[in-house]
Design a protein with these regions (language model features):
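Extracellular glycan-recognition regions
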Residues: 1-117
């Protein structure tokens, strides 16, 4: 997945929900925490006892936008946000939906491409 996310002034976080199931009991989430200057990948699994995992990296956001490249291979996820890399694993997450979210603001998703192999 390749996209450009842009957000309004004052937005706290934007991101992508990945591999979500219909009831949102399991998911992976790429969060761009605009206010805190970091990207993080978090995973949640309510099925196996409220398990929560987190990986993060610092990033400097410019002009209220970021280019995001997400590569998924099995349970391995590699993401680039404005050339800052974050790699992690999403165990026990199956095939699901992809979505976009925003916290306390507005987000726009442009130049989006989904590539499958």
């Amino acid at each position: 997945l390749q996209t450009t996310l842009s957000w309004s002034e004052g937005t706290e976080a934007v991101g992508l929900m990945i591999h979500t199931d219909d009831e949102l009991r399991k998911w992976c989430q790429l969060r761009l925490e605009v206010r805190h200057g970091k990207i993080l990948m978090d995973r949640y699994n309510r099925v196996d006892g409220d398990q929560y995992y987190l990986d993060e990296r610092p990033v400097v956001f410019r002009d209220n936008k970021a280019e995001v490249k997400l590569i998924v291979s099995g349970n391995i996820m590699l993401v680039y946000v404005d050339d800052v890399a974050l790699a992690c694993r999403c165990y026990e997450i199956g095939i699901g939906e992809v979505g976009i979210f925003v916290e306390y603001g507005n987000v726009r998703c442009t130049q989006t491409r989904l590539l499958e192999q």
